[in-house]
């Protein structure tokens, strides 16, 4: 239903944000930003 769809969207957004933070951190650590 709609609640499941919203929950999945929220999970996807959270995963995307986390991935972005990880990418930013790793590029800073490796000095490749």
UniProtKB/Swiss-Prot annotation:
Keywords annotated in UniProt: Amphibian defense peptide, Antibiotic, Antimicrobial, Cytolysis, Disulfide bond, Hemolysis, Secreted
Cystine bridges: 27-33
One Pfam family per UniProt: Antimicrobial_2
Summary of the tissues where the protein is detected: Expressed by the skin glands.
GO annotation, biological process: defense response to bacterium; killing of cells of another organism
Coiled-coil segments: none
GO cellular component, one term: extracellular region
Superkingdom, taxonomy of origin: Eukaryota
Subcellular location: Secreted
Main location: secreted
Keyword Secreted attached: yes
Family: Belongs to the frog skin active peptide (FSAP) family. Brevinin subfamily.
Annotated function: Shows antibacterial activity against representative Gram-negative and Gram-positive bacterial species, and hemolytic activity.
The name this protein goes by in its record: Brevinin-2Ea
Organism of provenance: Pelophylax lessonae
